[in-house]
Amino acid sequence: MSSGRGPRIPEYWYGQVPVPPFMRFMEVIYAGAVSLRRLAYRRGWRRRYGVAVPVVVIGNLVAGGTGKTPLTIEIVARLREAGWTPGIASRGYGRRDPKTPRWIQPDTPIELAGDEPAMIAWKTGMRVRVDVDRSAAARALVAEGCDIVVCDDGLQHYRLMRDIEIEVIDGQRRYGNGHLLPAGPLREPMVRGRLCDFRVLNAGQYSDRPTSGFGPGDWQMRLHIDHVQSLQGSRRRSLDAFSGQRVHAVAGIAHPERFFAMLRQRGIGVVPHAFPDHHFYRAEDFTFGSRLPVLMTDKDAVKCRAFADDWFFSVPLRVELPTAFWTALFDRLERLVSC
């Protein structure tokens, strides 16, 4: 039985429910503000800042999660393998004192880091800088020796000039009802996606070739789970070890039911506990009434390490994209540095 603490999304965003008239009115105001802001950057009325190294921005057009952070982590890992020294810029959503720029280490207190920057630092071991001004974060990373900046989220942060834009799309929900906030989930009009260099569809059916779309095409990404990692120590176990068992499954992410479904597909008996996205956990949150293993996403695990016991396990997501996607991405980077 779910804890019922997950986020509430308006039914009209993704369902067949009519949009309330007041929300349509507010959408018109929001659309005007978005258009004026873009015009200000395009005409030079608002200044943009660049850095002397390639900048890759990974983001989305809709409010809420689409799988950006797992893709960010995978891209950083691939860049390292190719000899780059990537640095990651992030806003650090939900952290205390959000206006203070900060370097994030794997052991930075979660309330100072924000959950996603903390997870990126933990999983990559690379430099992570949080700053509401991502252009300032990029400059700080370059000053520390990074030769490429990867921006986790920030598609709408036009203050930072970028070389490559990657839009991540929920392959199931796509753009919902197609309306802008607050009438729908869109931060910007759908046409904005045509300007991105790559579009990655999360949870779409896997293909080794791009589907019809813009630029290099719509690349389809799959997320896999195959092992668990103890939050205490380095003990790693196959996920099959929990097949046929009941576990407490914890997810404080945009779409917790997808994590629960992935576990069920592996034959695991799931007792689901959905929390709001970006929820900061306390030990009291895990008073479930039954002593079972606790399986959670990496994004949740990074916030539970301080009080976790031997029954707590993270379930890392493994990102799978076509080989041709990586070839196209690195070809683009090579062209940038050779100019």
Swiss-Prot record:
Gene Ontology terms describing biological process: lipid A biosynthetic process; lipopolysaccharide core region biosynthetic process
EC number: 2.7.1.130
SUPFAM superfamilies: P-loop containing nucleoside triphosphate hydrolases
Pathway: Glycolipid biosynthesis; lipid IV(A) biosynthesis; lipid IV(A) from (3R)-3-hydroxytetradecanoyl-[acyl-carrier-protein] and UDP-N-acetyl-alpha-D-glucosamine: step 6/6
Catalytic activity: a lipid A disaccharide + ATP = a lipid IVA + ADP + H(+)
Signal peptide: none
Keyword flag Cell membrane: no
PANTHER family: TETRAACYLDISACCHARIDE 4'-KINASE, TETRAACYLDISACCHARIDE 4'-KINASE, MITOCHONDRIAL-RELATED
Name used for this protein in its record: Tetraacyldisaccharide 4'-kinase
Species assigned in the record: Xylella fastidiosa (strain 9a5c)
Primary gene name: lpxK
